[in-house]
């Protein structure tokens, strides 16, 4: 049934021709952004790798026939093709705001149009090829007369159509209405133009409008990031019907194909929609099928002359789909295609399950091998029960229970929050927090409030407090311990309040009249600290362990058949024999990746970015892009924030002159803490480009210390997520690492600390990498780079103590457990270097790390 024009039409599935893969074209090194088809059947693709390529089918294969290279850094975002009187023309919309015009017989552009100020994200040729339309991030639509365009001389009389307030993403024309056009924008509106005059404004989408299809002079369709197709009446500028996608969160393109509409979008799918005029004359659009492709995003789709469908993927490929059995791909291609799709869907399913059940997986260090066992914790459940299940699954002794429970709480904020009673928020420095502790600095000063939330790690809360009050980083472990202890007290207090009974000697969980013998959940004995015997009741742990606690050892009695008596069972870390090649302590090896510089709202960075943006010519950011960057300072890193506009903002702003890059890198180091943006900028070619850009900045040795600080912080924060870790762990260290080490020796303490933190994170990434596979070279290279930079320093007294401690952490971690690397360090006289570093610190934690390094050299 037809709806009122505002509700979603329910989707049905009907039979349709079965599409299968015909060809997979490895077209571009990065995203294939746009497609076009010539009258002769040639396929054209434009990519983010700065190329446009022509593909012709010869026999059963697609072969590249032409390639047009764009200048370095000028990615292709839109293309349009036209047959003119003097030959074909290819129009290429580029990121710098230019439109390059190519033709036959020469590789260089016939002309370059410069009227747009920013990225040209859409191009359209009208049906008679008399005019081209272009849309840009500068919010303008420009109409270009192209009938007499040639390679020698022609002066354009362009028509600029202002009206949209944000980027223009799609264009269309009416075949039966000359000089009448449509434009769709990020401002959520569609405008109908006659020349440069706005005839109508269509409002109905709730997000960016990305695609347009004209059906007749009186009707058209639009689609966008709200996941809907809307059927519009031109005369009244009103919605006729609205249809919801079955596949895409965002719809990126929409194309007509015989009796179907094709849409591509965010989820790497191709959706088929059947069009039916309906008995009542109303148009009905029904989602019939969704084809999964291996790629993450599908940017565009075009119908070929033989009715096959070409789909542009974010993986740089072009996927050709067909219904003709004679054009079906060979079995090996089909198998590979299906395997990639299955892998993608499997990963998606696992991700959805994990999100649905809110399950967190952490690695538990039981014996001398780091990250050996997986522990899965479901948010909102009792960490004690989780620890019991973990022990049972892995056949571990019950005396590990307390240690594993604490381990879970230390690493998972939701576990610490379990059973915490809700209380009134406290306000510190104008912000609300769950709790706050008083910290006395001495010297007669009043206590400072150290705030923390139950959903954040003690380490992070302590780091925030240290940064806010400019305290030594060496006090972070102590402050984090205070917060952790307070969380434990709060948790116990909440448990007591819930039970309703508390014994002043044993605490909660004692015997309660008429209550279940094990309802307390713990049943702690005031003398043994372990589970007591309860007649006719199962052990308080929830599974039968066969013993209760020994009052002297806290462990169970000897049992000949017990699995823990095999000689190979796990034991507490404190009971392990000391291994001088693997020293352990609060800071050794590096306990986790350090994230630096997250305090504050970034008002100064935002103001500076806007100021410097006004000075840019080719790479000026539009309001959409600036707003996207501003959001980075207000969204938590757990939001997994990402958007194409934000990505493009960085791609453009990183092209600014070096002296203008300080605010850009300030935003980038925040972006790298978000999983999606980290994955985007640190993956494959983009990752190598990022590393190259950071190297270029440090090589230029800018006078601006803040710029060098932010380069080091970008490197450090890149280790926040796996893709960034893999990038820098696999990067050639001979160039970048020495540059970072050089910053450690700078006279500015803030630069020393930022660079040393980058090195510490680097060492941890290489250590974790070596645990998975033997790869000696990178650790050796990092060690050599550090030693080459610091071995000639006679005294480190001018360095900040915090930076020295981080540097020592980097050294001990890169050597940790690897006899070959330790031997290399020993041959390079690291004991003497460690002694000089030890002399420069007064803090015991720093001195202990230096002693650990010396002890390691004695072990080989």
Swiss-Prot record:
Where mainly located? cytoplasm
Gene Ontology terms for molecular function: ubiquitin binding
What are the recorded Gene Ontology BP terms? proteasome-mediated ubiquitin-dependent protein catabolic process; ubiquitin recycling
Record-linked Gene3D superfamilies: Leucine-rich Repeat Variant, PFU (PLAA family ubiquitin binding), C-terminal domain, YVTN repeat-like/Quinoprotein amine dehydrogenase
What SMART domains does the database record attribute to this sequence?
Answer: WD40 (SM00320)
Which UniProt keywords are present, listed alphabetically? Answer: Cytoplasm, Repeat, WD repeat
Chain segments carrying region Disordered: 494-585
Family per UniProt? Belongs to the WD repeat PLAP family.
- Domain PFU per the UniProt entry, residue ranges: 397-497
Subcellular location(s): the record lists: Cytoplasm
The cross-references to Pfam families, in alphabetical order and at most eight, read: PFU, PUL, WD40
Query: Could you tell me in which tissues this protein is expressed?
Result: Expressed in intestine (at protein level).
Q: What is this protein's function?
A: Plays a role in protein ubiquitination, sorting and degradation through its association with cdc-48.1 and/or cdc-48.2.
Any stretches that span the bilayer, and where are they? none
Task: Please report the name of this protein according to its UniProt entry.
Answer: Ubiquitin fusion degradation protein 3 homolog
* Domain PUL residue range list: 586-856
Domain comment quoted from the record: The PUL domain mediates the interaction with cdc-48.1 and/or cdc-48.2 C-terminus. The PFU domain mediates interaction with ubiquitin.
Q: Which SUPFAM superfamilies match?
A: WD40 repeat-like
An annotated GO cellular component: cytoplasm
| Quaternary structure note | Interacts with cdc-48.1.
Question: WD repeat ranges?
Answer: 27-65, 71-112, 115-154, 163-203, 204-242, 244-283
**UniProt cross-references to PANTHER family, sorted A to Z:** PHOSPHOLIPASE A-2-ACTIVATING PROTEIN
